[in-house]
Amino acid sequence: MGVMLQRCDSLKILNISNFDTSNVTNMGYIFGSCYNLETIYLGSFSTKSAIYIYNMFRLCSSLKTIYVNNDFEIMEDTDSTYMFLDAKNIVGGNGTTYNNSYTNATYARIDTEETPGYFTQQQE
């Protein structure tokens, strides 16, 4: 699944809420360099089996919103190097903005007052 949508320059909104990714191990660069992508709906998208999510949203320079549900979870040993590198317009659901110090999976969570993140809660 890695690089599946890389460089899809014509995409602005992507809804893959119903993709079954429960057994996918490589998600590296999956959305990388999608320069015009602004919104992604991930819904039931699962990264629990993922070993590689590096560069997942790298160079998504127009990306503002990533919607996920409460089940989105990244395992501790997953390689998330540069997951959000240069996704400079991203804003979490509680207003957290891109910070170059957090380009790995540290902020790959729903943005709340207590826990800053780059994701927005997707309504069911």
Question: Where does each model-flagged region fall?
Answer:
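Register-specific detector for alpha-helical tandem repeat solenoids, activating on a conserved position
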Residues: 2-3, 28-29, 54-55, 81-82
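Structural signature of tandem-repeat unit edges
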Residues: 9-25, 35-51, 61-77, 89-107
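Polar, enzyme-active/binding microenvironments
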Residues: 80-83, 119-121
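A recurrent domain-boundary module in secreted/ectodomain proteins
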Residues: 108-124
